[in-house]
């Protein structure tokens, strides 16, 4: 029997809205807010004042487990390099910026010297201006060429919204420069009639990696004049290019560099990143080029008050009678409501599209009870909207018409939202880099700001709100990506060959794994070797071999039955869990029921309904070891890393009451299984170790299962992954290892580097896992430690005390981490000896 937990989209069922919370004793952190300073004379309340008002309700102050004060910082000015055109400097000054910050001037100097550079400074530190000054100067020079297009620049953003926002900024900044600067967006929303003008006349093209992969590079002859003059490539928010998506983007960039070379261009790459560990190395992996880093942030910053907020326990009980906390979704909706009533401009960042819609709906309902004019000032912003809906929301946000917004990470990435007072983050976003990026959206223009992290009821969030040093005393993570992943590299070699025949010198550009893959691609009759190089042999488009976001397949369209109206799309990889038959789907505040999921036609038919429940899919998994790459002894057991094959099937879904989260029932589903070949870390335990840990056969399955759930929950603290990027399986007797085994694997074909990171930091990772379980206040396990909302076995069996004893015994003989003591950016945890349980309440 295998117990498993699969990567999937968030399914944060709406928690208890009206149930009375059970107040519990949470001692106020020693570093809690000092006495409130006097409110400033301006109309904008101080962050401390806003937080005090939020905490004023019954039992609310106990929910704040820690408050961190980041003091204001003064800025350091410099002067622009004299090679920047005076007209550009004048345009910048006309925009109200008299002098650059020191990091802006330094980055511009590198760009003018022809050096690729990454600017890794904080949110709102002016990274855009750092690359725009040299880019606009070069474009203005090029506009004086006989054809008016002597220089061009390409801008890559991870989202359409960011590209559209940047175009507005560039157009405004460059207005005094006349027709010398011609910015244009080229993405899936660009009307067909405008595309030819962009190709022939625009000299600053803003797009995304998806369009570069599918639209621009395969049609490079039509872009020849643009590519021939390409001087700069700007890669904005480059820290988001991690995991499988980042690996794909790295190969798309290598294809771009190859075509530029054929047209005689050698563009300089200008990258903008949030504060990150080793930004130069990460940018080098992404581009394949040496990259200089500018990481000393010289911009000023207002005070940031950062509160950690843990929702209270309720009177309700979950699976197996476990105590249940109020959901982060419901708690965030309350906070957004209160902030809107206070007139505080706020954004609530939510992990899932569904969560964003739920928070918006709840906030609107509650605001209507206060003032009927307020619901219109709150909205949801997420991916999957139609282009016209997305643009309308962006206009409302910029105009100030919207006061509160529930947004997914589509808004996290640098869109210029001025005047925000507060940010509420519903659940840890997976990395410290993303956490600080979201928190930094408030307090622009130097004013003070409030950020609140609301903990979800899971092991990692619970650990973090009670261990603030893991957030505030640790550096941000290194970016993990693997361009040599064969599942990533192979389709890009095919795409490159379709663009221009691949030659032997090209292979160095694509990395050492390219030469090994070519014979396999020939055998598969995808490529054919001729004297001029390797050629693409098929009629279909090579660029369609892969979805660079790692989602696979074509999107599933969500269509309203009866009217035929297209509501939006969902990725094929998420369709089995998000739009299965019977699923509840939210769109723009309306609720729909999925009547049919047609996988062949990639369509989900829905009808509007108002069910009093939400739905959560459940799945089961089997795993087989294909190859063990590395293994090291852990006492009598082994820690291994290698290739596995995972078979997953969505088998049912739960219906939960909206108000209480109570499970109403489970409905079986008949969906086909899906197979994934990927990379995994796994560990085994021997009978002697089980005897030492007092693990008898009756509790073995529950102990392994509990350790697996908790270890998945804690891995994002050690690797730059999200919880749904990884999956796990625990087996009391696995047929390949012939021992009790726990697997944790990458949820992407070919792997994404997360399991490898887990192998490298295994001692620290499993020590933190043990501590998270042992320090939880519950008796037999709860969502804060060992229960998982996605468990295909209904969180049964689980044995909390057995998991602690098992991990204690395993760690007793654990060698130092192969990655070394300095590579893990997670907090130091106590020894896992029986005498040092990490908590006086340890079982």
Predicted regions: what is each one?
Residues 776, 781-785:
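Short cysteine clusters
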Residues 12-13:
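Short hydrophobic alpha-helical segments enriched in small aliphatic residues
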């Amino acid at each position: 029997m295998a117990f498993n937990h699969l990567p999937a989209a968030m399914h944060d069922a709406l928690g208890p809205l009206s149930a009375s919370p059970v107040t519990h004793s949470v001692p106020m952190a020693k570093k809690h807010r000092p006495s409130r300073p006097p409110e400033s004379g301006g109309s904008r309340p101080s962050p401390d004042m806003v937080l005090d008002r939020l905490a004023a309700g019954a039992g609310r102050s106990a929910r704040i487990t820690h408050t961190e004060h980041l003091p204001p910082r003064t800025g350091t000015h410099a002067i622009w390099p004299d090679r920047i055109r005076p007209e550009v400097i004048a345009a910048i000054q006309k925009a109200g910026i008299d002098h650059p910050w020191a990091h802006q001037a330094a980055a511009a100097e590198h760009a003018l010297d022809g050096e690729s550079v990454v600017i890794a400074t904080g949110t709102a530190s002016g990274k855009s201006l750092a690359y725009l000054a040299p880019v606009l100067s070069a474009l203005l020079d090029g506009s004086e060429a006989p054809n008016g297009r002597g220089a061009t620049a390409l801008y890559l953003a991870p989202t359409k919204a960011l590209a559209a926002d940047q175009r507005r900024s560039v157009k405004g900044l460059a207005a005094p420069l006349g027709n010398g600067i011609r910015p244009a967006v080229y993405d899936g929303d660009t009307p067909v009639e405008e595309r030819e003008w962009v190709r022939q006349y625009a000299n600053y093209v803003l797009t995304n990696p998806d369009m570069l992969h599918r639209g621009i590079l395969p049609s490079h002859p039509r872009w020849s004049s643009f590519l021939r003059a390409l001087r700069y490539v700007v890669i904005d928010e480059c820290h988001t290019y991690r995991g499988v998506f980042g690996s794909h983007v790295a190969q798309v960039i290598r294809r771009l560099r190859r075509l530029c070379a054929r047209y005689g261009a050698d563009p300089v790459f200008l990258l903008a990143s949030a504060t990150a560990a080793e930004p130069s190395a990460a940018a080098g992996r992404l581009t394949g080029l040496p990259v200089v880093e500018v990481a000393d942030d010289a911009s000023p910053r207002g005070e940031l008050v950062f509160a950690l907020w843990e929702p209270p326990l309720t009177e309700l009980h979950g699976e197996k009678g476990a105590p249940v906390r109020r959901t982060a979704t419901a708690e965030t909706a309350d906070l957004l409501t209160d902030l809107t009533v206070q007139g505080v401009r706020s954004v609530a960042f939510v992990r899932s599209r569904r969560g964003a819609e739920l928070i918006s709906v709840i906030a609107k309902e509650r605001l209507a009870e206060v003032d009927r004019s307020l619901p219109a000032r709150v909205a949801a912003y997420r991916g999957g909207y139609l282009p016209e809906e997305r643009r309308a929301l962006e206009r409302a946000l910029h105009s100030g018409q919207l006061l509160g917004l529930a947004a997914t990470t589509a808004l996290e990435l640098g869109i210029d939202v001025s005047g925000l007072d507060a940010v509420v983050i519903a659940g840890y976003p997976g990395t410290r880099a993303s956490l600080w990026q979201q928190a930094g959206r408030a307090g622009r223009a130097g004013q003070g700001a409030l950020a609140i992290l609301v903990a979800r009821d899971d092991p990692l969030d619970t650990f973090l709100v009670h261990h603030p040093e893991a957030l505030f005393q640790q550096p941000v993570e290194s970016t993990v990506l693997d361009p040599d992943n064969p599942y990533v590299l192979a389709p890009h070699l095919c795409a490159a060959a379709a663009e221009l025949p691949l030659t032997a010198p090209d292979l160095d550009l694509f990395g050492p794994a390219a030469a090994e893959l070519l014979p396999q691609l020939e055998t598969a009759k995808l490529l054919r070797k001729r004297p001029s190089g390797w050629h693409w042999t098929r009629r279909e488009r090579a660029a369609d071999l892969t979805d660079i976001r790692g989602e696979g397949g074509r999107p599933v369209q969500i269509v309203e039955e009866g009217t035929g109206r297209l509501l939006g799309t969902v990725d094929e990889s998420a369709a089995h869990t998000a739009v299965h038959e019977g699923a509840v789907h939210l769109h723009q505040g309306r609720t729909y029921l999925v009547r049919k999921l047609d996988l062949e036609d990639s369509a989900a038919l829905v009808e509007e309904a108002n069910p009093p429940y939400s739905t959560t899919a459940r799945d089961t998994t089997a795993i087989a070891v294909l190859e063990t790459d590395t293994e090291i002894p852990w006492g009598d057991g082994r820690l291994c890393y290698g290739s596995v094959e995972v078979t997953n099937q969505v088998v049912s879904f739960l219906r939960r009451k909206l108000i209480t989260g109570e499970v109403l029932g489970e409905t079986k589903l008949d969906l086909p299984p899906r197979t994934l070949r990927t990379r995994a870390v796994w560990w085994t335990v021997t009978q002697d170790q089980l005897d030492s840990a007092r693990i008898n056969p009756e509790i073995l399955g529950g102990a392994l299962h509990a350790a697996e759930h908790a270890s998945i929950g804690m891995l994002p603290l050690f690797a730059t992954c999200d919880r749904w990027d990884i999956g796990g399986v625990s087996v009391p007797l696995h047929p390949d290892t012939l021992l009790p085994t726990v697997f944790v694997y990458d949820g992407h074909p070919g792997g994404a580097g997360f399991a490898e990171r887990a192998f490298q930091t295994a001692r620290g990772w499993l020590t933190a896992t043990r501590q998270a379980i042992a320090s939880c206040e519950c008796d037999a396990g709860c969502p804060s430690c060992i229960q998982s909302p996605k468990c295909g076995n209904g969180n049964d069996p689980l044995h909390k005390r057995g998991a602690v004893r098992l991990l204690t015994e395993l760690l007793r003989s654990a060698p130092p981490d192969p990655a070394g003591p300095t590579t893990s950016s997670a907090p130091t945890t106590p020894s896992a000896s029986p005498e040092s349980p990490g908590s006086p309440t340890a079982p």
